[in-house]
Amino acid sequence: MQVNDLGFVASILFVLVPTVFLLILYIQTASRQGGKDS
């Protein structure tokens, strides 16, 4: 059970952390381009 729980948490962090990082970069890039142009 402990190995499965650790693996489950590790999998979530492994997917969640890069996703949040990419979302932040995407939001910063989108905000820099300016929404008024589109």
UniProtKB/Swiss-Prot annotation:
Membrane-related topology note: Single-pass membrane protein
GO biological process entries: photosynthesis, light reaction
GO cellular component: photosystem II; plasma membrane-derived thylakoid membrane
Transmembrane region(s): 7-27
Any one Pfam family match given in the protein's UniProt record, by short name: PsbM
Compartments (UniProt record): Cellular thylakoid membrane
Keyword Membrane: yes
The organism's place on the tree of life at top rank: Bacteria
Keyword GTP-binding recorded: no
InterPro entries recorded: PSII_PsbM, PSII_PsbM_sf
Keywords for this protein: Membrane, Photosynthesis, Photosystem II, Reaction center, Thylakoid, Transmembrane, Transmembrane helix
Role summary: One of the components of the core complex of photosystem II (PSII). PSII is a light-driven water:plastoquinone oxidoreductase that uses light energy to abstract electrons from H(2)O, generating O(2) and a proton gradient subsequently used for ATP formation. It consists of a core antenna complex that captures photons, and an electron transfer chain that converts photonic excitation into a charge separation. This subunit is found at the monomer-monomer interface.
Quaternary structure, from the entry: PSII is composed of 1 copy each of membrane proteins PsbA, PsbB, PsbC, PsbD, PsbE, PsbF, PsbH, PsbI, PsbJ, PsbK, PsbL, PsbM, PsbT, PsbX, PsbY, PsbZ, Psb30/Ycf12, peripheral proteins PsbO, CyanoQ (PsbQ), PsbU, PsbV and a large number of cofactors. It forms dimeric complexes.
Stated family: Belongs to the PsbM family.
Name by which UniProt lists this protein: Photosystem II reaction center protein M
Protein species of origin: Nostoc punctiforme (strain ATCC 29133 / PCC 73102)
